[in-house]
């Protein structure tokens, strides 16, 4: 790490990686931004294209294509590399294929002398974040997955649309696996400072069955998008940007990242999407919500599925 200069290395210049890269340059988040890909020509082309956008950015960024050696001085390495989810394929279906890819990537990065923070986006993200932690040997606080940041954003957007409220004033979380077993924390959902359950009780036009449908659309959003355009990338690109800003700016912001549990929520030895305080050190602490009995059971099931899926590849 260079004093006073933030360096971010992106590994993987597919649609997700490039959406994140464009967001980073667009907002001028880091002084140095390096693109790494097994397809070196692709990384070079993307770096050239992005560098031409720098004059329009709010602050200058040095952009180049590089190698794992550039990770030595990096504050943050973001990994989006891996095989994408195909139509009809679940995130967990990808586990064996992408675990093999990830082990090679992480070893290459660590061989550079990297001692910063990992941010993982490749699916199945909770499992691959765990794999990264194990392979890297870094402290658990400095290995983070995108978790349910995107799911929570989708949730806030759809609830805001339903209630005709700015989604930035919707405070609601999706937790658990980033995938089919995720769950909404209805018991802590608020609009501004008012509980969602209170709004529901006092307004006949709002119905629980509508909210349940909203959650289903959140959970299945990736399937719907993949069916129509082949992949999702804008939303996750912005999600990664948000986590990056929280880290580099030492924000102490609460985001639903994939973080390591060691007793919180009654679970341990798993990376799962939960609210956590994010700053320059990575995960400062996990915010433990008081879940109701139904939410507790669903969360425990989500963790169980992740562990069962992960066991054969570790």
Swiss-Prot record:
Catalyses which reaction(s) = (S)-lactate + NAD(+) = pyruvate + NADH + H(+)
Q: Name one GO molecular function term.
A: L-lactate dehydrogenase activity
One Gene Ontology term of the biological-process aspect is:
lactate metabolic process
Residues that bind beta-D-fructose 1,6-bisphosphate, according to the entry?
156, 171
Write out the entry's keywords from A to Z: Allosteric enzyme, Cytoplasm, NAD, Oxidoreductase, Phosphoprotein
What activates or inhibits this protein?
A: Allosterically activated by fructose 1,6-bisphosphate (FBP).
Pathway named in the protein's UniProt entry? Fermentation; pyruvate fermentation to lactate; (S)-lactate from pyruvate: step 1/1
Whether Cytoplasm counts among this entry's keywords is yes
Give the principal location in a single coarse category.
Answer: cytoplasm
Query: Under the cellular component aspect of Gene Ontology, which terms does the record hold?
Result: cytoplasm
Which top EC class is given?
oxidoreductase
Q: Which NCBIfam families match?
A: L-LDH-NAD (TIGR01771), PRK00066.1 (NF000824), PRK06223.1 (NF004863)
The annotated subunit structure for this chain is: Homotetramer.
Free-text function comment from the UniProt entry: Catalyzes the conversion of lactate to pyruvate.
Could you tell me what this protein is called?
A: L-lactate dehydrogenase 2
Query: Which lineage?
Result: Bacteria, Bacillati, Bacillota, Bacilli, Bacillales
User: Which gene is transcribed and translated to give this protein?
Assistant: ldh2
């Amino acid at each position: 790490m260079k004093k006073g200069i933030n360096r971010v290395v992106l590994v993987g210049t597919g649609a997700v990686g490039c959406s994140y890269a464009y967001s980073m340059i667009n907002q001028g988040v880091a002084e140095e931004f390096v693109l790494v890909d097994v397809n070196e020509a692709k990384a070079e082309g993307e770096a050239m294209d992005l560098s031409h956008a720098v004059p329009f950015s709010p602050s200058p960024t040095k952009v180049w294509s590089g190698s794992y050696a550039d990770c030595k001085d990096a504050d943050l390495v973001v990994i989006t590399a891996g095989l994408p989810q195909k139509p009809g394929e679940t995130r967990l279906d990808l586990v064996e294929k992408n675990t093999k890819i990830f082990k090679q990537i992480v070893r290459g990065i660590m061989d550079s002398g990297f001692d910063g923070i990992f941010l993982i986006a490749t699916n199945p993200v909770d499992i691959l974040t765990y794999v990264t932690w194990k392979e890297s040997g870094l402290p658990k606080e400095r290995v983070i997955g995108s978790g349910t940041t995107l799911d929570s954003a989708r949730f806030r957007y759809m609830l805001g649309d339903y209630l005709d409220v700015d989604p930035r004033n919707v405070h609601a979380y999706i937790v658990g696996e980033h995938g089919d077993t995720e769950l909404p924390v209805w018991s802590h959902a608020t609009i501004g400072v008012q509980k969602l359950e209170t709004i529901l009780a006092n307004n006949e036009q709002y119905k629980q069955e509508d909210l349940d449908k909203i959650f289903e659309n959140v959970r299945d959003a990736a399937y719907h998008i993949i069916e129509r355009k082949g992949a999702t990338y804008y939303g996750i690109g912005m999600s990664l940007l948000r986590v990056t800003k929280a880290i580099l700016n030492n924000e102490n912001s609460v985001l639903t990242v994939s973080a390591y549990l060691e007793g919180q929520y009654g679970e341990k030895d798993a990376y799962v999407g939960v609210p956590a305080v994010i700053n320059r050190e990575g995960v400062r602490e996990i915010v433990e919500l008081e879940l109701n009995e139904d939410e507790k059971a669903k969360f425990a099931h989500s963790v169980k599925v992740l562990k069962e899926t992960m066991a054969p590849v570790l």
